[in-house]
């Protein structure tokens, strides 16, 4: 059907949804069964174990990364109660340093009969030393933080706060929450955020940047606008925080408090997040907590619930199951054990970790949580975990239908519940293309909170290269060679190997007048995988297509895009690639994969504000289909009439839907309606109260 034009700047007041968020009901954790007295060997499968535990803390926490599941080491039978020394962090599941936050309050006085006995740490250390279990584990965060270079420009009072720094940050209108992107790495999401900040100079911004660890990039890739007041960095891996957390696992808690933790988890699984709100205020939020939730981790009732959730699994030992739960708790602690800078709006640019921090900031400072999904991060994280192509559909049934072992099932459930919580807490959720709204609903997204708001581009900035392309189109009949460009990171998801295969098919079929340049920006804006880059180079040589596929270093791809007859996007997943917006603004057609937001950008019939239909600006084929892509590249060169239509439609589509000023007016209206600035905005116009 026809997609009607996005009307930007004409939405009524944003109000909390009157419809309660109804998450897809999933299987809750069952109540624990009575335990026999004997403690069994923790290396046995959970299906073979039912135990009596007074207090348990991890043997050797290990956990999967987003794409791998390391095996836990074999350990002997656990003593009656365990509390580890500084627990080693997992290889990629983060353990982070906290920006200064109040110390965890001591638990309130409780009746001795209801408090579980603390463990003998010295005794445990001696036992662990005999086992030799800890000595063999990698210690994350052991390097001292590198000296951080203050990044570019910003306002005269721009402040950088890294973990361990206690300086107070000023209140801002909007705190954008980023994970491993802006301002320290470039890419489509980072470019979008830079544009948002730069084109809303009447509002003040701060950046909460979630980085892997102290070795992550810390030099800005952008000239930060003057309305950026601070950058606050959170590390996901830190020895200090890991040690602090391992101590908190021994915190005394009552039976009722353990039950409160379990009730919050079980209720969230069924879509009721109110108990989790109460738990956050009572036992997690540094501003309001009166006890520590982390002590529940090592107690009998909690572990029995975990055993029950694992069911009759025979592929995970008790110690591995505990390590899994430990890492889930450690991640939450890493992100939430902090007092966040004050803002009126917390704008997360991905669900997951960034969304969780933004939701916490909104609660702490009585602000609003606004979520933008550039990609569907929950879907992508699950697909990476399960080694699937990123374009594959994911639903709430993924833990049961897609996973092959207990580790995968628990981690898939983790991502689903984290996404559902993000969607429930957000005041408004914007997506770059319509299909993303539908896909998010299958992950627990609420349609009544959804709005399609694409990225935009500045028309005037590309006027000269646009004229050059317009002058080239009438000469198509006389062309003797064609140049196609590819822009993007050298990563498997970008489909470069499949593109090289397509070129080989085309050349073997006698089509030798087409050359493809793989543009490699030298400004640090790409995040190449060295192994994959080497594979691509070797593949070009192996197929003997060096004369038809060329690697070209460029400072900025937009500076040379006018030299090319088409942009090829062979990816397995894309939302709305900025390179495609640049190409279309010059009138350069797009060919590539039918994934993500590419259909909305390139092929779906649109209708502008005057109800005039706008056709395709190129053609797309299934991802990974090298033969179809070879045919499409040849087709581009064989019909001047089709090429002219794609050229004209590219310009028309940009003018109708993707101009930056209209997109930025909508962002400004959203921010103000959520409480930023001094005036409320309705329909893009400021309304003085």
Model-derived regions: residue spans:
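Donor nucleotide-sugar binding/catalytic pocket of nucleotide-sugar-dependent glycosyltransferases
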Residues: 307-333, 343, 399-468
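Nucleotide-activated donor-binding/catalytic signature segment of Leloir-type glycosyltransferases, i.e.
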Residues: 401-405, 529-554, 566
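Conserved donor-binding/catalytic core segment of Leloir-type glycosyltransferases
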Residues: 460-461, 466, 472-494, 500-505, ...
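Glycosyltransferase donor-sugar binding loop
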Residues: 515-534
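Aromatic "clamp/platform" in nucleotide-sugar-dependent glycosyltransferases that forms part
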Residues: 572
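Short hydrophobic beta-strand element within catalytic cores of glycosyltransferases
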Residues: 589-592, 596-603, 610-613
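Conserved acidic donor-binding segment of nucleotide-sugar-dependent glycosyltransferases
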Residues: 604-626, 635-640
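A short, well-ordered alpha-helix in the C-terminal region of glycosyltransferases
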Residues: 628, 635, 642-657, 663, ...
């Amino acid at each position: 059907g026809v997609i009607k034009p996005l009307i930007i700047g004409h939405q009524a007041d944003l109000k909390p949804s009157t419809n309660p968020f109804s998450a897809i009901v999933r299987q809750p954790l069952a109540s624990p069964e009575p335990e026999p007295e004997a403690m069994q060997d923790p290396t046995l499968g959970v299906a073979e174990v039912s135990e009596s535990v007074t207090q348990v803390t991890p043997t050797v926490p290990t956990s999967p990364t987003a794409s791998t599941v390391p095996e836990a080491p074999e350990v002997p039978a656990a003593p009656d109660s365990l509390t580890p020394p500084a627990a080693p962090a997992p290889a990629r599941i983060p353990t982070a340093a906290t920006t200064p936050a109040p110390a965890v309050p001591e638990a309130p006085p409780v009746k001795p009969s209801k408090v579980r006995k603390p463990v003998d740490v010295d005794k445990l250390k001696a036992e662990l030393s005999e086992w030799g279990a800890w000595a063999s584990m990698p210690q994350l965060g052991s390097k001292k933080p590198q000296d951080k270079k203050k990044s570019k420009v910003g306002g005269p009072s721009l402040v950088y706060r890294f973990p361990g720094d206690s300086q107070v940050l000023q209140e801002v209108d909007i705190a954008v929450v980023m994970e491993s992107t802006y301002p320290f790495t470039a890419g489509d999401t980072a470019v979008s955020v830079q544009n948002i900040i730069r084109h809303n100079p009447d509002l003040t911004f701060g950046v909460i940047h979630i980085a892997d660890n102290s070795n992550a990039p810390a030099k800005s890739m952008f000239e930060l606008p003057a309305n950026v007041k601070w950058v606050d960095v959170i590390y996901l891996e830190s020895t200090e925080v890991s040690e602090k957390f391992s101590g908190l696992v021994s915190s005394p808690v009552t039976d009722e408090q353990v039950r409160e933790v379990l009730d919050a988890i079980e209720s969230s699984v069924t879509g009721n997040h109110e108990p989790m709100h109460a738990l956050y205020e009572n036992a997690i939020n540094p501003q309001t907590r009166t006890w520590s939730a982390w002590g529940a981790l090592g107690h009998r009732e909690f572990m029995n619930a975990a055993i029950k959730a694992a069911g009759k699994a025979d592929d995970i030992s008790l110690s591995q199951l505990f390590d899994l739960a430990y890492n889930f708790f450690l991640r939450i602690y890493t992100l939430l054990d902090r007092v966040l800078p004050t803002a009126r709006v917390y704008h997360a640019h991905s669900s997951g970790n960034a969304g969780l921090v933004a939701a916490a900031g909104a609660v702490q400072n009585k602000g609003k949580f606004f979520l933008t999904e550039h990609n569907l991060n929950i879907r992508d994280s699950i697909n990476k975990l399960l080694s699937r192509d990123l374009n594959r559909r994911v639903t709430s049934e993924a833990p049961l239908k897609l996973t092959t072992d207990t580790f995968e099932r628990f981690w898939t459930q983790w991502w689903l519940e984290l996404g559902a919580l993000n969607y429930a807490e957000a005041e408004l959720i914007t997506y770059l293309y319509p299909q993303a709204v539908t896909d998010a609903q299958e992950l627990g997204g609420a349609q009544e909170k959804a709005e399609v708001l694409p990225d935009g581009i500045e028309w005037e900035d590309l006027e000269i290269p646009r004229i050059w392309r317009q002058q080239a189109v009438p000469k198509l009949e006389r062309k003797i060679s064609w140049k196609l460009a590819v822009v993007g990171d050298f990563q498997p998801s970008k489909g470069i190997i499949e593109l090289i295969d397509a070129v080989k098919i085309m050349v073997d079929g006698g089509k030798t007048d087409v050359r493809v340049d793989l543009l490699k920006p030298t400004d640090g804006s790409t995040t190449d995988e060295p192994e994959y880059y080497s594979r691509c180079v070797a593949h070009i040589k192996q197929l003997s297509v060096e004369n038809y596929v060329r690697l070209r270093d460029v400072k900025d791809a937009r500076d040379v895009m006018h030299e090319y007859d088409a942009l090829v996007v062979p990816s397995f997943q894309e939302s709305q690639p900025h390179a495609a917006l640049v190409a279309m603004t010059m009138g350069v057609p797009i060919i590539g994969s039918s994934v993500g937001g590419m259909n909305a950008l390139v092929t779906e019939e649109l209708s502008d504000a005057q109800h005039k239909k706008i056709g395709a600006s190129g053609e797309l084929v299934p991802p990974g289909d090298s033969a179809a892509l070879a045919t499409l590249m040849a087709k581009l060169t064989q019909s001047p009439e089709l090429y002219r239509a794609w050229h004209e439609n590219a310009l028309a589509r940009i003018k109708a839907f993707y101009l930056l000023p209209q997109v930025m007016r909508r962002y400004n209206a959203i921010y103000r309606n959520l409480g930023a600035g001094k005036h409320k905005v309705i329909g893009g116009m400021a309304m003085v109260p």
